[in-house]
Amino acid sequence: MQGEAPRHELMTRFREAEAAVLVGSAGFWEGVDIAGDKLSLVIIDKLPFAPPDDPIFRARSQAMARSGQHAFRELALPQATLALKQGAGRLIRTETDRGLLVICDERLRTRSYGARILSSLPPFRRLESFEEALDFLAED
């Protein structure tokens, strides 16, 4: 689990383990390269929007609003989309890799911007149910 040891040590243990689960935050979305069957499942709990109280994000949003721009559409959404693509990219590193990406955030299905975010992801096969996911993981 992230925080129990330095990142490089956690990554080494994960790579060397026969079967392992690595729990990490967005800090593991960049610089992680685990190709092959060692990484077969990535779970993303929520869309990676910047916190609205982040001082840099707030300053940029305010500056955009003053100039008539829409901060959510032109700043928050593109940033979250790029971050999600980076997170999803941890799963498939080579042409022969396969795995399951689970995004738990309902906003992908309930908000108008959800389709835009999904269309920016690599062309994964989309599954809608737990049963479909189990079937996918059972495939050779």
Features from the language model and the residues they span:
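ASCE RecA-like P-loop NTPase motor cores
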Residues: 1-140
